[in-house]
Each structure stands twice: as structure tokens, then as C-alpha cells.
Amino acid sequence: LFLSLGRSGLAGDIGDDAAVIRPSGRMAVSIDSYSDGVHFNRLVPDDSIGYRTVTGAVSDISAMGSAAESVLISMGLPRKVSEEKFFALYGGIKKACKKWSLKVEGGD
């Protein structure tokens, strides 16, 4: 699903659980997790949750005086999550990535 957001500058193809990146200088790296009932509640639309997760990562990198170029995506979802919910989350992630010209490098 994220192949359309992949980056051609990777040292290899888009990863599954990791990405091999050749930094051209200093690199700021950040990781966040968002939990239901802590960072959002069930009233928040799924696409907004996906969008917010990317926005949070961009904000963290910006706070370090750097510019985000790519993201790694990891989702811990219930086994019986609906396709509708999954694609809504993905849609929010994709929208945010397009807004900030980010590439999905891999994830879990």
C-alpha cells in the first residue's frame, strides 16, 4: 500500500521492518507511538488519527531544527480491524505525507 509513497533514494527498495538509508550529513531521527484512549479517543475519525501521527513526527523533527524527509510506519491494530478502518488510517497517513512531501521508507 505504501509503495506509491516510497523513496527512490534508499540504499535498497522500500523496507518491510527497516530501511537502509545513506545519510548525506547529520540526521534527526524520532519515534512516536499513539494509543487509543491516551492520544485520541474513538470519536476521532480514523483518517484524522493517521494524519495526526505523521503530523506529530513532523513536529518533533521540526523542533530539533531539522526538516522531515521520510517516515517509518508501524501499526498495532486489533486482529479483527475492518478494512474500512485500516484504509481510513492509511488515507490520513498518505494525505499528511503528501502535504509535507514525505516518503514512507518502511515500517512494521
Task: Please state what every model-predicted region is.
Residues 1-62:
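N-terminal glycine-rich phosphate/pyrophosphate-binding loops that anchor nucleotide-derived ligands
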